[in-house]
Amino acid sequence: MNVLGIETSCDETAVAIVKDGTHVCSNVVATQIPFHAPYRGIVPELASRKHIEWILPTVKEALARAQLTLADIDGIAVTHAPGLTGSLLVGLTFAKTLAWSMHLPFIAVNHLHAHFCAAHVEHDLAYPYVGLLASGGHALVCVVHDFDQVEALGATIDDAPGEAFDKVAAFYGFGYPGGKVIETLAEQGDARAARFPLPHFHGKGHRYDVSYSGLKTAVIHQLDHFWNKEYERTAQNIAAAFQACAINILLRPLARALQDTGLPTAVVCGGVAANSLLRKSVADWKHARCVFPSREYCTDNAVMVAALGYRYLIRGDRSFYGVTERSRIAHFSKRGGDRLAAQRSAASQPLF
C-alpha cells in the first residue's frame, strides 16, 4: 500500500510517499527557515501563506522522486492536530480535496503520535515502550501502548525545550533556529562554565514533568549569578552550559519512567531528539535501550505521517471529510503518572 503523507503543522511543507509503512519512496521537505530567520521565530501568517504557495509543487516533487503517479497512491494521510491553525488548515484542506477527487481513502492523524511512529520506519519495535517527545512545541513523557494509544506520565508545565533553545539563541544573537546553532557552538565550549539549576517541583504529581521557564530566566537574566568566574564568557561556553542543563532536564523524567515502568525500551523523538548530546547521554545506559529516529525523521516530516496513516488504513479506519484542524490537543491525562507513583514502594529509594 502506497500512502501519501502531508505535514504542514508548523513551518515545514512536507510530503512523503511510504510503501507498507516502512519503505520510504520519497521524502520532500520545503523549509521556511530563511523566511522566518529575520524575525528570530515563526510568524504564523507567513507560514500559512508559504504552505499555500508550496503544497502543490511539493506533492508533485514527491511523486516525481518516487517515480509514481497519483494513480499509484492507495491512501492519503495528513496531520490535523496539534499545530498552527492556518498551517494545519492548508494541509488538511489540500488532503481532503485530493482524496475526494481521486476517490482515495483519507485519514487525519495526530502529529505527536506520528513522531513516535517515525522510529518504527527504521526499527523493529514492540509495544509497549517508554516515550519521550521533545520538540519546539511539546515535551511529553509517556508509555506508548500502540500506534494510537499513548498514556501520558508527564509533560512540560510551561515552555517546550525547543522553544527554550530558540529563545536563548535569539537573546544572545546566536542565530535561528536555536537548536542547531547552540549545538554547534557548544561543541567548542565547556559546560562547566555555568551551573544552572534544575527545576524543582512542589507537590505531588510532577515526577515525570519538565520545566524550562526557570532555565531560560537563569541564562538570559541571571547569568552573573550562575557563572563560573574561572571561565571566559564566550558564546561557546554559554551555549555549552545551557545545552547541558537543557538536556539533563529531559534525562531525569525519562530515567524515572524507565525505572518505574520496568520497560526495557524507550523511544526518543521530536526535533530535539536530533541533538547529539542527548543521543550520547543515553547511549551507554545499561538499564534500557533508547531508540532514536534518524535525524531527518526527528524534525517535522511527512514520512512519519504516512507511516502512521498506513497503520490506520490497514486497520480499516477512515476520517470523515468533516474533520477539522485543531491547534491544541485535549489535555493529556496524567493518570498514568499517578498510577505509577502509587505503585512505587514508599520504602524504596529512587535512583533518579
From Swiss-Prot:
Cofactor(s) required, per the database record: Fe(2+)
Keyword Cell membrane appears in the UniProt entry: no
Residues reported to bind Fe cation: H111, H115, D300
Stored Gene3D superfamilies: 3.30.420.40
Keywords: Acyltransferase, Cytoplasm, Iron, Metal-binding, Transferase, tRNA processing
EC number in record: 2.3.1.234
Catalytic reaction(s) noted: L-threonylcarbamoyladenylate + adenosine(37) in tRNA = N(6)-L-threonylcarbamoyladenosine(37) in tRNA + AMP + H(+)
Main enzyme class: transferase
Family per similarity comment: Belongs to the KAE1 / TsaD family.
This protein's name: tRNA N6-adenosine threonylcarbamoyltransferase
Organism: Treponema pallidum (strain Nichols)
